[in-house]
Swiss-Prot record:
SUPFAM superfamilies referenced in this protein's UniProt entry, alphabetically: N-terminal nucleophile aminohydrolases (Ntn hydrolases) (SSF56235)
Keywords for the protein's UniProt record, in alphabetical order: Cytoplasm, Host-virus interaction, Hydrolase, Nucleus, Protease, Proteasome, Threonine protease, Zymogen
Pfam families, alphabetized: Pr_beta_C, Proteasome
Name this polypeptide is given: Proteasome subunit beta type-7
Chief localisation class: cytoplasm
GO molecular function: endopeptidase activity; threonine-type endopeptidase activity
Gene transcribed to yield this protein: PSMB7
Functional note: Component of the 20S core proteasome complex involved in the proteolytic degradation of most intracellular proteins. This complex plays numerous essential roles within the cell by associating with different regulatory particles. Associated with two 19S regulatory particles, forms the 26S proteasome and thus participates in the ATP-dependent degradation of ubiquitinated proteins.
Listed GO biological process terms: proteasome-mediated ubiquitin-dependent protein catabolic process
Tissue specificity statement from the Swiss-Prot or TrEMBL entry: Expressed at a low level in colonic mucosa. Up-regulated in colorectal cancer tissues.
Length: 277
C-alpha cells in the first residue's frame, strides 16, 4: 500500500494569529467609519544607581498631556516607606495610586512585623499587583531602598516583570540615560559620584527626549540618612529679557480708523416689597 505524503509547512516559534485578528478588526472598523484606539504616549526619564553605601534615584519633572506640557515641576519620586522610594513613569494617575496603595500595605506589614520592610517585599507586592492587571495599569517603576541586607534596586514593568540591576533607567528618555550609565558607571562609587552620574543621565534624557524636561530631582537613600533633593539641578533655566519689548505709541502706522459709539439703553425698575406682617 502506497504511503500518502502530505506537505506540512514548517511551524515557527511565534504565533501571529492575534496580528491577523487585529488587521481584520481594523479593516472592519474602517469600513464602518471607526478607528481603533491608539496607545497613550507618555514621556519621562527616571533612573537609579547603586553606590557604595546606598541608592541614588533620579527623575525629571515634566508632565505631559499629548504634546502639551501639563506641569513643569511635578514630583515623580514617590514615598513607599522610610527606607524605600520609587520613581514612576507612564500614566501619572496609575503611578501615584499604585505607589500609595503599596505604601499603605507596607505600613500595615511594618506594624505587624515590628520592623522596617525589606525592598524585596515592596518589589513582590508591586509585581503581583501589576501582573494581576495584565499591563492595563500604565506604571513603569524604578524601586530602590536600603534594608538590613543592604541596598537594592529594581526595575518593574507594567506587565509585572522585574529586574534587579546595579543601574536602571526607564521612560521615553531611557535610551539616552542608559548610554550615560553604560559609559560611566563603575562599582562601589562614592555618594557624590553617584549623584553626578544620575544627574547626568537624567539630563541626557531631558535634552534628547521631548517628553522629558524641566528640573532634576534626586533621592539619596543610605543606612543612616535620607536626602530628598528637589530640585537638585535646573538644566533648563528660563532666560531673562535683555531689553524692553513694548513699542511706543505711534510706532506702527494706522491706515484707517473708525469709531463707533455705543448705544446704551437705560431701563428703570422698581421693586415693591411684600408686607409679611
Amino acid at each position: 500500500m502506497a504511503a500518502v505524503s502530505v506537505y506540512a509547512p514548517p511551524v515557527g516559534g511565534f504565533s501571529f494569529d492575534n496580528c491577523r485578528r487585529n488587521a481584520v478588526l481594523e479593516a472592519d472598523f474602517a469600513k464602518r467609519g471607526y478607528k481603533l484606539p491608539k496607545v497613550r504616549k507618555t514621556g519621562t526619564t527616571i533612573a537609579g544607581v547603586v553606590y557604595k553605601d546606598g541608592i541614588v534615584l533620579g527623575a525629571d519633572t515634566r508632565a505631559t498631556e499629548g504634546m502639551v506640557v501639563a506641569d513643569k515641576n511635578c514630583s515623580k519620586i514617590h514615598f513607599i516607606s522610610p527606607n524605600i522610594y520609587c520613581c514612576g513613569a507612564g500614566t501619572a494617575a496609575d503611578t501615584d495610586m499604585t505607589t500609595q496603595l503599596i505604601s499603605s500595605n507596607l505600613e500595615l506589614h511594618s506594624l505587624s512585623t515590628g520592623r522596617l520592610p525589606r525592598v524585596v517585599t515592596a518589589n513582590r507586592m508591586l509585581k503581583q499587583m501589576l501582573f494581576r492587571y495584565q499591563g492595563y495599569i500604565g506604571a513603569a517603576l524604578v524601586l530602590g531602598g536600603v534594608d538590613v541586607t543592604g541596598p537594592h534596586l529594581y526595575s518593574i514593568y507594567p506587565h509585572g516583570s522585574t529586574d534587579k540591576l546595579p543601574y536602571v533607567t526607564m521612560g521615553s528618555g531611557s535610551l539616552a540615560a542608559m548610554a550615560v550609565f553604560e559609559d560611566k558607571f563603575r562599582p562601589d562609587m562614592e555618594e557624590e559620584e553617584a549623584k553626578n552620574l544620575v544627574s547626568e543621565a537624567i539630563a541626557a534624557g531631558i535634552f534628547n527626549d521631548l517628553g522629558s524636561g524641566s528640573n532634576i530631582d534626586l533621592c539619596v537613600i543610605s543606612k543612616n540618612k535620607l536626602d530628598f533633593l528637589r530640585p537638585y539641578t535646573v538644566p533648563n533655566k528660563k532666560g531673562t529679557r535683555l531689553g524692553r519689548y513694548r513699542c511706543e505709541k505711534g510706532t506702527t502706522a494706522v491706515l484707517t480708523e473708525k469709531i463707533t459709539p455705543l448705544e446704551i439703553e437705560v431701563l428703570e425698575e422698581t421693586v415693591q416689597t411684600m408686607d409679611t406682617s
